[in-house]
């Protein structure tokens, strides 16, 4: 009999187990079978669903429904009862209209990569707390957005409409928008009212549209007082836009347009701008003082423009040399005229800008590079930056040293081709230097494609080996002194020299001995010895091989003569059949081999021969011949009985 205390213990244990298992069973039943639920995160993505499954827990906060086949009919009406849901991922589905029946308090909605064509006020008014709306890669057009569709979206901060069918910026956007992405559409015009009132807008992306200067209003961006980033990449602008908001703009992207001029007031009052990119345009010069108001500029990128380093660009060199170290300027490489092509504007001396009215004394430093004697000058190449002095002794005299500025440093360069793809550069310095910038460029190639190569060498070095060059190609080598602050001296002139790499054939210095050897085929003294040794080894090997073959052939012939037997029709005299004939040997077969066993040469006595008459038992024939009743020697041989020992009964 069970005691009352023990009964109470068992009852309490069962009740405890029930309350522990009950929540698990309820939770298991509340999660749809095709989904996975994890603390408010419902994972129903990538399951080829055509509708949103029912039975989603009421405490769900994030719904992952992307990469399915859900259409508008597949969104159940009870979905709007999930009041705790804040994020819904419905991208890459089969929606063709803006979905309804969404939870009221959703804040982040991802609908990209569908086929949504219309946006109505009815659909947006049901989710008034929406903050982020992603509609990239759909079929939304300007006329398919209902007028006033966003008038109740007072919390909307991010609106992404990239890669749609928009031809203009949608009107009536809420003032709360901070980021607006309209890239890769068909927008060709932007009127001032389009962006009017978007005082909270911080980032505006208009890349990949059809915008030109005529399609932009005079002050279309001027009222965007909080705009920090403006991107107009991959459009059809021919001039930099003006009247930009100068209060907060920090990043301006204008690359990949057709800009060939910059108005003098384009960047006025942009004192907060720290990044400006105008790469891949058609700029050849810049108006003087265009960057004067850019007090906080740290990144200026101007790559792949056809810069003409004439007198109009001399101010750029002076401005570059006055910049602090923190300012990073890229892409100011001369494309013309030919004499300075491939050189950095920062490296050019005042004489190279050809400013005739500037009053600059055209004094040329006589300490130039020693020409490469192995490479003749060619008329079609541009003249070097500095001229070769018409003196035999390259060593400077006292008078020649005083022709330039006393602070000017002298460099003497010598270039020698070592191999078809290597040149040796050596130099001498008249005064000690901290560092030098060494650069080389293949002539006839645009430096915009990376043909120019630069390196920094310390002042203690006096030579440098350049490898991986193209054989039989012209190159220009330049050297410029540098200070420790990484700024060039104002009066420093780059010293350049032109050379050519050797052809692909073996490079030989032009000495008298080599000229004599060129008349004869090239001979290497080490090759005959190796050839003699190799030939001797080959001859010995061939002789040994021939000897072995002869020996095998000779022994094989004798062996064949002693052991050969006829492969044709056998005759009764070919074998010593059943030991009844006198022979010197008997063919003994052992499994798969045979052996010749000699027998005594003494004649076998006739008394040992016994002829047995074979009588078939019970009148049975010893063989069966289907073709003929007559006997034949072949039939008997097939039966295993010798021909001569067989007799009929």
From Swiss-Prot:
UniProt-listed SMART domains: LRR_TYP, LRRCT, LRRNT
GO cellular component: axon terminus; axonal growth cone; cell-cell junction; cytoplasmic vesicle; cytosol; dendrite; endoplasmic reticulum membrane; extracellular space
SUPFAM superfamilies according to UniProt: L domain-like
Matches recorded under InterPro entries: Cys-rich_flank_reg_C, FN3_dom, Leu-rich_rpt, Leu-rich_rpt_typical-subtyp, LRR_dom_sf, LRRNT, SLRP
Domain LRRCT span(s) in chain numbering: 305-357
Disulphides: 31-37, 35-44, 309-334
Keywords, ordered alphabetically: Cell adhesion, Cell junction, Cell membrane, Cell projection, Cytoplasmic vesicle, Developmental protein, Disulfide bond, Endoplasmic reticulum, Glycoprotein, Leucine-rich repeat, Membrane, Repeat, Secreted, Signal, Synapse, Synaptosome, Transmembrane, Transmembrane helix
Segments passing through the bilayer: 529-549
Residues covered by region (Interaction with ADGRL3): 38-67
Domain LRRNT: 29-58
Region feature (Disordered): 378-405, 629-649
Residues exposed to the Extracellular side: 29-528
Topology within the bilayer: Single-pass membrane protein
Function: Functions in cell-cell adhesion, cell migration and axon guidance, exerting an attractive or repulsive role depending on its interaction partners. Plays a role in the spatial organization of brain neurons. Plays a role in vascular development in the retina. Plays a role in cell-cell adhesion via its interaction with ADGRL3 and probably also other latrophilins that are expressed at the surface of adjacent cells. Interaction with the intracellular domain of ROBO1 mediates axon attraction towards cells expressing NTN1.
Protein name: Leucine-rich repeat transmembrane protein FLRT3
Organism: Rattus norvegicus
